[in-house]
Amino acid sequence: MTDFKNIKAFTFDIDGVMTDGGILADLEGQLYRTFDAKDGFAVRMACLNGFPVGVITGGRSQSIRARFSSNGINPEDIYLGSRNKIEDFEDFCRRHNLKPEEVMYFGDDIPDIEVMRAAGIGVCPNDAVEEVKEAADIISDRPGGKACVREYMEKAMKAQGRWVFDAIAYKK
């Protein structure tokens, strides 16, 4: 059984984790992704309950920053266009005075493997590539974009008695 009690922060990739990996593009080159609102709620709950949360993605779209800033993530903790995810993960840990083993990381593809191995708990959706499944500590029962992030953020917060909904803080 996985011990979630030492987790002090959460970090994740976007495409294939928070989304199903599908990207729509219009004629002007604007990219569109679909996110599960349950994942967004879990991110907001984590932020409201004092957990640092970070995004480390190869995607460059400013809509990612807008989406997750609105859920409470500090814009400085949103690493867009990441080509060296372990470096960005280490920066996130340093900025929050965390040891890598105190952070849960969600990833789905080869660029995520090094971070998954460094993190305290590496989680992947059930449709992640095989190499990631082999590196993961946990394989979710859910595919990317279908609340696989919520599933394990919630478990970690509940294990610590920190899955607490404050309606007043949530409305701010």
Residues of each region from the PLM?
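Alpha-helical substrate-recognition element adjacent to the catalytic core
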Residues: 1-87
